[in-house]
Amino acid sequence: RRYLRTHEHGNTETSDLWDAIGAAVGDEPVRSLMDSSIWQPGFPLVRARVEGRELVLDQQRFGFDEATRSDPSIWQVPVHVRVGGAAERRLLLGAEPQRLALDDPAAVVVVNAGGHGFYRVAYDQALRERFTADALRGLTTIERYQLVDDAWNAVVAEQLAAASFLGLAERFTGEDNHAVWQALAAGLRGIGRLVEGDAHAALRQRIRDLVAPALGRVGWTPAAGEGPLTAKLRGLLVSVSAVLGGDVDAQRRCRELLAAADTDPASVHPELVATAINVVAATGDDTDYERFLGQFRRADTPQAQLRALYALAEFDSEVLVQRTCDL
């Protein structure tokens, strides 16, 4: 209201709005906070570690390469921190590290509590290990999602070992949220590209063990009245187990579902049909490729043609990938 009254029928600059908000809220440095977010590229990484009975927070620019990470840019970062079951604590992190006294130095620490901040978080190993399966149940959905997403991006940035991400992921056996599983799947898929041979076989087993509890809870058969996100979660879990986990039983069931859908499309839930197509293609051979290629060429609707084309892109064979590129 102050902003509208002051500049009624006039022209303004961006900073006029920040100044008006700052005047309304009092001592908060709104203008410097917003300027640091708008007038420089990138976004911050807030690093958290425990020293004695203190939580120490500092920042650097987040980046996937050393040149970006060494950028000296500093943001005014409003940070919400929750320690154990205590109320959230709010602070403004600038160039100097912030130290928070901890009543319980062994408590679970959640930086970016509530998930509202536009920054990534890097926990040191000691803090990361506190996110046990029990502790994860005390986090909100967005907090769990960001924990996984930040950890995987740290792996991509070569700031966290893939084994550490996998260890964190394995604590999510009680997870039933589709968005969180999407983040987990992205990381597991990426790790699968990094290993081969015996290590890849061991990774697949660990993925199957991770997915099995959640897939057991949601089941293969859609329940009456279930929501669309439950159906999407089922499809995602089946795909992760069958493709990333190499679950031969899941692969077999997907082939059976696809055969049933070919005979009677209404007999299989659309999400399971889409999943079955993905799984059969990702684990398929030349015969499967020819099947989807025929469907692509004979499709009588744009939707059916796209579905077949997407299936062709899932095949792993270098020769088949090249055939798809040459279409």
Where are these regions (language model features)?
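Non-catalytic accessory/interaction domains
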Residues: R2-L327
